[in-house]
């Protein structure tokens, strides 16, 4: 996979990163509202 890292379009990386960040934030807030986020 080291050969394909330089060939991946930046917009794909940005989109995937954005979705992961939004997903993590969503899970964090959902967990905190459910009472599970207090352990974090």
Swiss-Prot record:
It is a single-pass membrane protein. It is found in: Plastid, Chloroplast thylakoid membrane. The keyword Cytoplasm does not apply. The keyword Chloroplast applies. GO terms for cellular component: chloroplast thylakoid membrane; photosystem II reaction center. Keywords: Chloroplast, Membrane, Photosynthesis, Photosystem II, Plastid, Reaction center, Thylakoid, Transmembrane, Transmembrane helix. Gene3D superfamilies: 6.10.250.2070. Belongs to the PsbJ family. One of the components of the core complex of photosystem II (PSII). PSII is a light-driven water:plastoquinone oxidoreductase that uses light energy to abstract electrons from H(2)O, generating O(2) and a proton gradient subsequently used for ATP formation. It consists of a core antenna complex that captures photons, and an electron transfer chain that converts photonic excitation into a charge separation. PSII is composed of 1 copy each of membrane proteins PsbA, PsbB, PsbC, PsbD, PsbE, PsbF, PsbH, PsbI, PsbJ, PsbK, PsbL, PsbM, PsbT, PsbX, PsbY, PsbZ, Psb30/Ycf12, at least 3 peripheral proteins of the oxygen-evolving complex and a large number of cofactors. It forms dimeric complexes. This is Photosystem II reaction center protein J. It comes from Ipomoea purpurea.
């Amino acid at each position: 996979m080291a050969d394909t890292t330089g060939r991946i379009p930046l917009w794909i990386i940005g989109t995937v990163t954005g979705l992961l960040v939004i997903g993590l934030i969503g899970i964090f807030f959902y967990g905190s509202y459910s009472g599970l986020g207090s352990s974090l």
